[in-house]
Amino acid sequence: IMRLTDYSGGDIVNGQVLFQSASSGALDLTTANDDTLRSIRGNEIAMIFQEPMTSLNPVFTIGNQIAESLILHQGMTVAQARTQTLALLHKVRLPDAERLADSYPHSLSGGMRQRVMIAMALSCQPSLLIADEPTTALDVTIQAQILNIIRELQRDLNTAVMFITHDMGVVAQMADDVVVMWRGRQVEQGTVEQIFHNPQHPYTRALLAAVPRLGSMQGQPLPKRTPLIVLEGDTL
């Protein structure tokens, strides 16, 4: 969607990604030029990645990394961006914002780094937030806190959230509508109630069967094994 794969050898071979941009109107992101994409990334579409330690730059302070998008997209001065950065750190419930803004990523815990990523992603109040497995690397207590923050900010800022996850427990908490993907293709779509109460595709049922249930010790058969790579008859 954000065309980040362009920089790692990826290529979009067919299809469209239609987006209603506040600045450029309706456009197809697959054919948008670099200037248009640069104005949209981080401004109208933002992303929270799975592992914040590899997403944050280790040689810049937390405050500088949040302020960067505010200066670039919002036209703020350095002083204005600093003030807004501190407000964002408070909004994601990080204490001692002044000290944290001058800290480097390695000095923060995993949960704190992910809160910084949320603050950075929502700094320009995007219309779409893509959350790619944002809680997978966190323990369940921190996971619940992060999900609650995303939900509250989504409501307060009126931001649409595309949540990518394999955890159906998270889907039940966060989603209104669900699209189930299998082997890169959409196999089922519906409201969260339809998916959970009347799943149609075997893969959807397998995902739901993987959710732990209190008092249940009965195992479920594994889904059909899918090869990752086939090389001259050898399956990996």
Residue ranges and their predicted role:
Residues 123-127:
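A short, proline-enriched helix->beta-strand linker immediately N-terminal to the Walker B motif
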Residues 171-173:
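A short, surface-exposed alpha-helical micro-motif characterized by mixed small hydrophobic
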Residues 16-28, 80-99, 208-209:
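Conserved ABC ATPase "signature" region
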Residues 26, 192-236:
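Charged, flexible cofactor/metal-binding loops and thiol motifs
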